[in-house]
Amino acid sequence: MLASPATETTVLMSQTEADLALRPPPPLGTAGQPRLGPPPRRARRFSGKAEPRPRSSRLSRRSSVDLGLLSSWSLPASPAPDPPDPPDSAGPGPARSPPPSSKEPPEGTWTEGAPVKAAEDSARPELPDSAVGPGSREPLRVPEAVALERRREQEEKEDMETQAVATSPDGRYLKFDIEIGRGSFKTVYRGLDTDTTVEVAWCELQTRKLSRAERQRFSEEVEMLKGLQHPNIVRFYDSWKSVLRGQVCIVLVTELMTSGTLKTYLRRFREMKPRVLQRWSRQILRGLHFLHSRVPPILHRDLKCDNVFITGPTGSVKIGDLGLATLKRASFAKSVIGTPEFMAPEMYEEKYDEAVDVYAFGMCMLEMATSEYPYSECQNAAQIYRKVTSGRKPNSFHKVKIPEVKEIIEGCIRTDKNERFTIQDLLAHAFFREERGVHVELAEEDDGEKPGLKLWLRMEDARRGGRPRDNQAIEFLFQLGRDAAEEVAQEMVALGLVCEADYQPVARAVRERVAAIQRKREKLRKARELEALPPEPGPPPATVPMAPGPPSVFPPEPEEPEADQHQPFLFRHASYSSTTSDCETDGYLSSSGFLDASDPALQPPGGVPSSLAESHLCLPSAFALSIPRSGPGSDFSPGDSYASDAASGLSDVGEGMGQMRRPPGRNLRRRPRSRLRVTSVSDQNDRVVECQLQTHNSKMVTFRFDLDGDSPEEIAAAMVYNEFILPSERDGFLRRIREIIQRVETLLKRDTGPMEAAEDTLSPQEEPAPLPALPVPLPDPSNEELQSSTSLEHRSWTAFSTSSSSPGTPLSPGNPFSPGTPISPGPIFPITSPPCHPSPSPFSPISSQVSSNPSPHPTSSPLPFSSSTPEFPVPLSQCPWSSLPTTSPPTFSPTCSQVTLSSPFFPPCPSTSSFPSTTAAPLLSLASAFSLAVMTVAQSLLSPSPGLLSQSPPAPPSPLPSLPLPPPVAPGGQESPSPHTAEVESEASPPPARPLPGEARLAPISEEGKPQLVGRFQVTSSKEPAEPLPLQPTSPTLSGSPKPSTPQLTSESSDTEDSAGGGPETREALAESDRAAEGLGAGVEEEGDDGKEPQVGGSPQPLSHPSPVWMNYSYSSLCLSSEESESSGEDEEFWAELQSLRQKHLSEVETLQTLQKKEIEDLYSRLGKQPPPGIVAPAAMLSSRQRRLSKGSFPTSRRNSLQRSEPPGPGIMRRNSLSGSSTGSQEQRASKGVTFAGDVGRM
């Protein structure tokens, strides 16, 4: 019968947790006697419910715990008298426990105190038996069961925390079911790295809203982030795909950050101390600088205080949540990336760069300085967007108290991203500078040019040094680009000036000061460039600034450490073989084409912008040109291409150019510039233009397009699609293509007549050979990096030499492109004609010099502008044929004709003629002059020989009779009757041309011819004889040698004359150093089987004849620019004359080829050699097109063999394109090709 009351008592006990905590123990009844029978039912708290409260184990546990806590004070509580209870007949009242009494109730009766005691302390042995009766044992079991259950749950919880619920695919990382964070699209659990026993963060990212492409992009970003290790970047350990609750997710294992974020810190402390703000802001900047300096740069795009984590033990901060902006894009449906309060204005347009992280950093600093969320006054993102785009700052900006912090924040959150601070600027700011007790200062004023700087090292604590210095500064010299801060600090430690413990602070202080100086110099240089730019870009006059041959000033190294990767390519001088030029120079480089940074002689001088040297291509050049400068012209290098695009009439070198291009010290985000150039034009079947593009990633792309069938938009779209040009370069590319098309069509229309004759003589297999051209920067106001050159010259143009402009310094054709020789923008028109040696006269302001020393000797001679008709004096009357004797080779010095162009677009070029000189001999047409000018260096591309190509200069329009083969000259000097005889002179310094006895020499026709007008040019002749032009029958090029004519070149001139015709050593030096032009008559170097070379003896060389070069190319010999031609009033007459004169000389082509072939056979017969099979006359070889090789990795020798149009005869030795000559000297690298020598023992 007592079971029911016991059950009810247990329920009452479970409901008394609050009552027992608030009330003292109840007193006894009114009479002081214990009540008999079942106790009255206690009124329930929720009396409205009829049914009792259901049993709950959880409720029972809580009651037992609370009762156990209350047992300490409920038992000793003394009874207090209470008001008397109502009678028993009354309704049920609250149960009250009687006080402890000495009177024991009878067995079987119920006491109110027993259950309470049992509940409070069930382990008391002194409890009376009535307390543990049948009705009170059930309550005693409740606390025991609860304690056991609690212990069991505790163990289960511990097991759950120590037992992994998931593992990584490789088993290294474990996941525990302990959630430590949750975001909008990620959940973070605690994990463990079993290899290092370090706790990690296990992040599960939801990617169900991402598309397939976005998911792939995110995976790539995560893979990229794995390799990042920086003390201020949260470390990424691993990532993989996993299936969670039936959905694919990405798991990231990152470094565990348990001390919260900057956001939680601000919520807790509300205000951040300035020193903490300084330290943490500097650490954030370092982390951002590390991300932005990667290649390619890594952008955070969602930087805010919630993503900056605090490392508790060290008190440093780390940037986290990298790469999650891709997920956030899809997580917020159509919204943009990032948090609106921290988003830069350009983020809304999704056209951004590293500047967006600078903007977000400024907002983070604003929140740290004010403990107020930016734009908290705005109600929604739309209001924030309006304030951000309108340039209004958040209201909290005006609450910043520290002026320096306010200045930094203002510089970071500017609307224009170009006006914001950069990460480097912020790190160099005085507010973020660390106080390490070490200061480095400038000991002298920096002029921005000196490579060496005097610096002072000051240390605050005088006792820190190894020697007592009384806190005096240590002065030392630091060479920019050569010294390293660590090396300087190590030297100080070794000398005892600095303690070893101060090595790191000193090195860091020096490094930071040097970096600040370099940044300052860079800003000043950019400011000077902007000031020097003209208001409206226009075609400036063509200028060729001259620089001294051997540069004496070493240029400073790139200013930024990161600038090394932007260092422009410099090319070694004379490292290109003309036989391999089709492959090598088209790709702008060869196996020996890179300039070592340690080669000071080949580095541009400090005053010359390095961008001018980035495209210096050193090639066997034909001429040294000096084009007049009307003012302080801009410096420009002909760099990437080795031919002038002026000859095609498409020169746009100077269009849109400023005074100089950007120097190599660039921003980290600068990309390499692209270059576009025209290599050939043909209208044989279709009007096709072939161009070559150097892409932004230094790849060479050759493409052709039809003038009639392809539109510029289609070409640009294809280039962008194939990633040959950047989207930002598309507009500039379109402008260049349109300009190319317009100019090509203009030239094609003008030359339809003359070219019809050329097409008739072309063989079906011949195609116009591509011709390298000058790179031309695009006048793009948007700072595009695309450059183009629209040259249409023939491929046979190897180069024209650019000489430096320092007066008095001679030019050496052997080193035509010294790296310090910039070329200013402007139309450059190389008028290539046979080499000559004009005497000093006002009509020859420039001359090419031949020196046995191939070191650079640039000439400086300004070209005067002339308002009169351009002069083109080239008389042939004093140019006798050169011949090669069989015995010791004497020096032949034919008189030379001089070409002087007074037109500003035509630099005067010295030229000689290998035509027979007679008073009645008609001059060649001006058409052939232009044609031969373009074809002068044709053999250097086919199979070059050092020397000068002797070709006919322009002649007045008169019929040219067939030239008979001259009879050989006897060894004794006797000369058979012939109108064409070489003028023989001694090996010593040749005297001026004068009449000689008929037995030995022919009397000169005339000392000096009267000027003759040919078209728009005046042709005159010079008195001074030229160097001999020995014949080179089997070589595609026949070399001669020009002689210097400027007054300041007397010593070099005499040296050349002494060495011109003498022994093999002098002739080898002459051949090695003379690259100014190449002729049809040259000495042929032939080696016998026994290693000795037979000397040529006996009769003089047969006549060499000019080549009909107009048969060999299409529209590549047009030497007049469209701008110059359009400005002249005599264009129509000039072009009509060209057409007629070309027709007249077509008949001579076959005669010349026949004569030359016979001359080669006669030479072999005189030498006692068997003529090689397939002899082709040099004039005929010019017409054979060179094979174009793919940009494969052929060895140089293999390329030489692949590109030879004709196999060389027996005994011909080919020089390696890398070694240059047997001496292997660097100065002689330009001399490679096929040559014959008259010496016996020399290789």
UniProtKB/Swiss-Prot annotation:
SUPFAM superfamilies from the UniProt entry: Protein kinase-like (PK-like)
Biased composition (Basic residues): 663-676
Activity regulation (UniProt): Activation requires autophosphorylation of Ser-331 and Ser-335. Autophosphorylation and subsequent activation is inhibited by increases in intracellular ionic strength: Cl(-) potently inhibits WNK4 kinase activity via direct binding. Also inhibited by K(+) ions.
Pfam families in UniProt: CCTL2_WNK, OSR1_C, Pkinase
Molecular function via GO: ATP binding; chloride ion binding; ion channel inhibitor activity; protein kinase activity; protein serine kinase activity; protein serine/threonine kinase activity
Annotated tissue distribution: Expressed in kidney, colon and skin.
Alphabetical list of Gene3D superfamilies matching this protein: Phosphatidylinositol 3-kinase Catalytic Subunit, Chain A, domain 1, Phosphorylase Kinase, domain 1, Transferase(Phosphotransferase) domain 1
Disordered as annotated region, ranges: 1-142, 526-564, 630-683, 751-871, 943-1110, 1166-1243
Basic and acidic residues composition-biased segments: 118-127, 1065-1077
Protein name per UniProt: Serine/threonine-protein kinase WNK4
Species whose genome carries this gene: Homo sapiens
Taxonomic path: Eukaryota, Metazoa, Chordata, Craniata, Vertebrata
